Amino acid sequence: MQNVNTYDCIKKLVTQLISVLIVINTIAWPSIPKAYPIFAQQSYENPREATGRIVCSNCHLAKKLVDIEVPQSVLPNTVFEAVVKIPYDMQIKQVLANGKKGALNVGAVLILPEGFELAPPDRIPPDTKEKIGNLYFQAYRPNKNNILVIGPVPGKKYSEIVFPILSPDPALNKETHFLKYPIYVGGNRGRGQIYPDGSKSNNTVYNASATGRVSKISRKEKGGYEITVENTLDGRSVVDTVPPGPELIISEGESIKVDQPLTNNPNVGGFGQGDAEVVPQDPLRVQGLLLFLASVTIAQIFLVLKKKQFEKVQLAEMNF
């Protein structure tokens, strides 16, 4: 009986410990650099604003390049590759949430036309599966299968991300047509500078909140600094807090102005967006084009043969 009580006690203690860890992880999760795709999904119904800007740029302030490659035309109900390229210098390291340096992650959002969606696993060709690797794609919303997000994933391994896309069949989906459609993409490398609530991350520059003289700089126990700025006019002091990560570019005794940078800008990443176009091709149109080309080729062959025959007749008449 005592053993049973002891077992129940231990089981209860372990359950409580797991619950506490889950709560702590939930609270701390936003500061972790792996959270950025979720920020957009939680805060915005659509990742692309009416102005054409993708909402990831609200948190990732630096502009960087991103590129996308898709076929110019695709047949209905076929799988094709959309390759998103997020280039950056693989040697650089970023500031992590704890202030230490680490490798960059990358992420991307792909906005497809209505009707296009992620290809089912059983439809993806083996060579495409090999390019995808262990990547996991998800829909931006349960009702938006045409908007796909990925990341964060290690940038050194996935600076090129291959999306397997299934094209629609206009014969079955009456909302799609054999027209030219735009595809939009956004891609980022590294952590953002601002969280959705407007607060700064430790991956950005910190500015002075007041004009005055730096009277004291204190290093905090867990990293970062507290900078005391004394107003030389009224003697009031303001304390600016800098989290671990950014490096100070001011010193004690220095006179500073409001909004003057106190730190360097540690950000080495950035966000970029691009677009491409794809045209679903009508198979009958393709067959008609091939038939037309074949008929033109045959006509040219007959024309050449007829010309040679005519030349032979002319030559025979001249000899006669």
UniProtKB/Swiss-Prot annotation:
It is found in: Plastid, Chloroplast thylakoid membrane. Keywords: Chloroplast, Electron transport, Heme, Iron, Membrane, Metal-binding, Photosynthesis, Plastid, Signal, Thylakoid, Transmembrane, Transmembrane helix, Transport. One of its GO terms (molecular function) is electron transfer activity. Binds 1 heme group covalently. Residues 1-35 form the signal peptide. It is a single-pass membrane protein. Heme binds at residues 36, 56, 59-60. Pfam families: Apocytochr_F_C, Apocytochr_F_N. One of its GO terms (cellular component) is chloroplast thylakoid membrane. GO terms for biological process: photosynthesis. The chain crosses the membrane at residues 286-306. Its cofactor is heme. The keyword Cell cycle does not apply. HAMAP family: Cytb6_f_cytF. Component of the cytochrome b6-f complex, which mediates electron transfer between photosystem II (PSII) and photosystem I (PSI), cyclic electron flow around PSI, and state transitions. The 4 large subunits of the cytochrome b6-f complex are cytochrome b6, subunit IV (17 kDa polypeptide, petD), cytochrome f and the Rieske protein, while the 4 small subunits are PetG, PetL, PetM and PetN. The complex functions as a dimer. Belongs to the cytochrome f family. This is Cytochrome f. It comes from Huperzia lucidula.
